[in-house]
């Protein structure tokens, strides 16, 4: 997920300067094409006379201004799967349309290149399956979860990214967006009540701690913010951005989901315990919340570490062929490890903070009994 957001952020950076700096340049959108035929030819490689394979691809444009146009496009296969686009007949591809003249009116005014295989249809299918299962299993809560997911994505794309691109502090921007996302998500799913308010306060304070610890980790570990090649591309497009700040922001956003989950679990537990026995004191409710929180700490911290470990599995496999001292001191390795640890530390803060806030707010609201089982009857505490 973190890499996806980085790539999308890079696209924002590449698009915005073009629109601002050159209003006369013709910029054409990418289009969809269909591979109708492929012929294979041997070709001279670019490196030391190595032999490579060339696919002479017949592509038909399926969308846009030049729909129906057919082109022969050379597709080089070097044997490196990281860069090769190995096509087969019937594949749908993304086409990059490059204008040759200041005005574009006919297919002869453009060059057409194969940018990549089209994968968005598969993404749409799995998204639809996910939403359908969410509605089928979650019922009403599933519907509110979908709304919260969409709202969070909108906050990231239309609030966080523009704020960073326009020079706002990435850390403050990430904390602000994280708090807004928390408010929307928890109130939508849990209703307006003291339980939800407790979870929001616990998450918000923990996010601030995550921001502070991320700054400390980056400063003392001398992290550069350049942990992958996408960061180098971003630097080429926008060298004015704070890459250490962007790294800290990514740590904060990555920890957000686990923090919300932890806070909601603790607040819900404290609320259920109090509903069972209303004679319990704030201290007793706090202790109950801490007991549950201690169980949550292990699983949620493990979840964060496994997420980072899974996304960096090739990097982990690299450790078998490199000195361990050198491996753990690599910038990319240190970045991934510290990111997981920052999220885990934030969870540790989230447990006692949410427990004490929930114990106090839920006990305080006992004068007005709130039925938490019926969200439509909830009132703002």
Protein language model features and the residues they cover:
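Sec-dependent N-terminal signal peptides
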Residues: 4-15
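Sec/Tat signal peptide C-region and signal peptidase I cleavage site
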Residues: 16-20
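Structural detector for short beta-strands of small beta-barrel domains
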Residues: 26-55
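Extended, hydrophilic extramembrane loops/domains of integral membrane proteins
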Residues: 79-120
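Transmembrane alpha-helical segments that form the functional core of multipass membrane systems
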Residues: 127-234, 241-254
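Hydrophobic alpha-helical transmembrane segments of multipass membrane transporters and ion channels
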Residues: 152, 205-210, 248, 252, ...
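Helical hairpin unit composed of two closely spaced alpha helices linked by a short loop
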Residues: 256-264, 270-316
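Hydrophobic alpha-helical transmembrane segments of membrane transport and translocation systems
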Residues: 295-298, 307-381
């Amino acid at each position: 997920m973190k890499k996806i957001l980085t790539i999308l952020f890079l696209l924002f950076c590449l698009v915005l300067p073009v629109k601002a700096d050159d209003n006369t340049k013709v910029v054409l959108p990418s289009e969809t094409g269909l591979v109708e035929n492929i012929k294979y030819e041997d070709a001279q490689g670019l490196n030391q006379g190595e032999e490579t394979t060339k696919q002479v691809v017949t592509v038909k444009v399926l969308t846009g201004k030049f729909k129906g146009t057919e082109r022969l496009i050379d597709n080089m296969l070097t044997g490196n799967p990281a860069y090769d686009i190995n096509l087969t007949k019937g594949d749908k591809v993304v086409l990059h349309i490059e204008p040759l003249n200041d005005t574009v009116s006919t297919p002869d005014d453009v060059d057409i290149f194969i940018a990549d295989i089209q994968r968005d249809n598969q993404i749409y299918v799995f998204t639809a399956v996910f939403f359908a299962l969410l509605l089928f299993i979650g019922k009403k809560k599933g519907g509110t979860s979908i709304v919260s997911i969409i709202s969070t994505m909108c906050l990231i794309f239309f609030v966080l990214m523009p704020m960073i691109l326009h020079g706002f502090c990435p850390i403050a921007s990430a904390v602000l967006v994280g708090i807004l996302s928390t408010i929307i998500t928890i109130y939508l799913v849990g209703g307006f009540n003291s339980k939800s308010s407790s979870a929001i306060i616990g998450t918000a304070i923990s996010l601030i701690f995550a921001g502070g610890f991320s700054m400390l980790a980056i400063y003392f570990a001398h992290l550069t913010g350049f942990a992958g090649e996408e960061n180098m591309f971003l630097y080429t497009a926008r060298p004015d951005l704070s890459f250490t700040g962007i790294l800290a922001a990514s740590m904060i956003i990555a920890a957000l989901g686990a923090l919300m989950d932890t806070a909601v679990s603790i607040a819900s537990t404290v609320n259920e315990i109090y509903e069972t026995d209303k004679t319990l004191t704030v201290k007793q409710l706090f202790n109950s919340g801490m007991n549950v929180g201690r169980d949550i700490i292990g699983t949620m911290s493990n979840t964060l570490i496994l997420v980072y470990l899974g996304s960096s599995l090739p990097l982990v496999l690299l450790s078998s062929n490199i000195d361990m001292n050198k491996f753990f001191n690599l910038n990319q390795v240190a970045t991934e490890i510290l990111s997981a640890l920052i999220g885990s530390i934030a969870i540790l803060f989230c447990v006692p903070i949410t427990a004490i806030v929930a114990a106090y707010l839920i006990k305080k609201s006992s004068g007005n009994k709130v039925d938490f089982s019926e969200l439509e009857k909830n009132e703002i505490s």
